[in-house]
């Protein structure tokens, strides 16, 4: 574009030079001067408009974050799946919406997901609820009973089969009228160390 401007200026300068055609009247000279000024102004305004139109979007694109600083009406409603996947991968793992889990219908599962969890224990709450060891219900008699007995307090194990009634009677006879005192775990260890010395 600048080459065209220089070429036009050279043509006007050569055609308006007094030595080329001889002495023209002052009216023609004034006419050529006005034409030259108008031509230069129009070319300069066109160049400024093109530069301002081209520079502004590049400047705005450099400044903008892909999901930010856009007018709400100009945001793309239908994002491509690749763009959506990229946005999902860039999110913090704790903030990701677990859309692929089919357990969101359960309100307790949804509330458990909103809590912060250790990374190795994520989503375990969805599979089973935590319960007090003494109040757990057996879901399967085979596999869960061994695990349940391992995790319960040794004195609170459940009896299986026909011995349930006998265990209930033994528990009633075992408990005295006074409630059992609980001790701090550290105190219990001290007492155990002292017992062998007493014998």
Swiss-Prot record:
Keywords: Amidation, Cleavage on pair of basic residues, Hormone, Pyrrolidone carboxylic acid, Repeat, Secreted, Signal. The modification Proline amide is found at residues 66, 72, 93, 119, 133, 154, 185. Residues 147-160, 179-190 have a biased composition (Basic and acidic residues). Residues 1-22 form the signal peptide. The modification Pyrrolidone carboxylic acid is found at residues 64, 70, 91, 117, 131, 152, 183. It is found in: Secreted. One of its GO terms (cellular component) is extracellular region. Residues 48-90, 129-160, 175-199 are annotated as: Disordered. Pfam families: TRH. GO terms for biological process: eating behavior; histamine metabolic process; hormone-mediated signaling pathway; negative regulation of glutamate secretion; positive regulation of gamma-aminobutyric acid secretion; positive regulation of insulin secretion. It comes from the Eukaryota. Functions as a regulator of the biosynthesis of TSH in the anterior pituitary gland and as a neurotransmitter/ neuromodulator in the central and peripheral nervous systems. This is Pro-thyrotropin-releasing hormone. The lineage of its organism: Eukaryota, Metazoa, Chordata, Craniata, Vertebrata. The gene is trh.
């Amino acid at each position: 574009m600048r080459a065209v401007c220089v070429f036009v200026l050279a043509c006007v300068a050569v055609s308006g030079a007094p030595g080329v055609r001889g002495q023209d009247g002052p009216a023609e000279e004034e006419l050529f001067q006005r034409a030259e000024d108008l031509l230069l102004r129009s070319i300069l305004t066109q160049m400024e408009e093109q530069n301002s139109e081209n520079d502004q979007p590049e400047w705005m694109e450099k400044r903008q974050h892909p999901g930010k600083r856009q007018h709400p009406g100009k945001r793309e409603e239908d994002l491509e799946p690749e763009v959506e996947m990229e946005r999902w991968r860039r999110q913090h793992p704790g903030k990701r919406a677990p859309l692929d889990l089919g357990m969101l219908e359960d309100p307790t599962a949804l509330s458990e997901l909103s809590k912060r969890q250790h990374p190795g224990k994520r989503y375990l709450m969805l599979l089973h609820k935590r319960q007090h060891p003494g109040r757990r219900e057996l879901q399967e008699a085979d596999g869960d009973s061994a695990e349940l007995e391992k995790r319960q307090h040794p004195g609170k194990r459940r009896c299986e089969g026909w011995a349930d009634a006998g265990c209930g009677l033994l528990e009633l006879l075992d408990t005295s009228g006074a409630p059992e005192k609980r001790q701090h775990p550290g105190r219990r260890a001290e007492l155990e160390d002292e017992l062998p010395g007493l014998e």
